[in-house]
């Protein structure tokens, strides 16, 4: 997939249009998020990883999603405010998006194809599914929502060496 990954058009939660091209050459952790989920405290761990590795070429891209139990009901502005006030999130958040089904964000379709889940399933099962992408744009690994950000630290460190 590599180069194609960078062609995806995206909308930041501010409404600004962008592509993944601006993240070319960086290690990425792409996550579908939610504000009212049992895994929401993972924002704290994600922010810790971001602060630890951002200056070394690491980015976290957060994509709020309301497809799982309607646990992300707010507007993009509400979501950004919640994340900043409660968890100090400073990594980029994008417009609320779908990750499964006919209206799924094409980026997530590509991620799921490159890194299927358990038993080859491509569907994202819940909030805080994480995809690790190397600096060349290759999707290396998919992490289940139950995997805490701190458990991914060594994988990120290895890619940044």
Segments (PLM) and residue ranges:
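Chalcogenol-based redox active-site neighborhoods
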Residues: 1-161
């Amino acid at each position: 997939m590599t180069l194609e990954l960078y062609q995806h058009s995206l909308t930041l939660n501010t409404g600004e249009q962008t592509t993944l091209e601006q993240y070319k050459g960086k290690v990425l952790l792409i996550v579908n998020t939610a504000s009212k989920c049992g895994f929401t405290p993972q924002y704290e761990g994600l922010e810790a990883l971001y602060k630890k590795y951002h200056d070394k070429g690491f980015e976290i891209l957060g994509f709020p999603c309301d497809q799982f139990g309607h646990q992300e009901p707010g507007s993009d502005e509400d979501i950004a405010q919640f994340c900043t006030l409660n968890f100090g999130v400073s990594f980029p958040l994008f417009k609320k998006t779908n990750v499964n089904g006919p209206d799924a964000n094409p980026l997530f379709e590509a991620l799921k194809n490159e890194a299927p889940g358990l038993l080859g399933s491509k569907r994202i099962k819940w909030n805080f599914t994480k995809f690790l992408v190397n600096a060349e744009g290759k999707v290396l690994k998919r992490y289940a929502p139950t995997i805490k950000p701190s458990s991914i630290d060594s994988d990120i460190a290895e890619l940044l060496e």
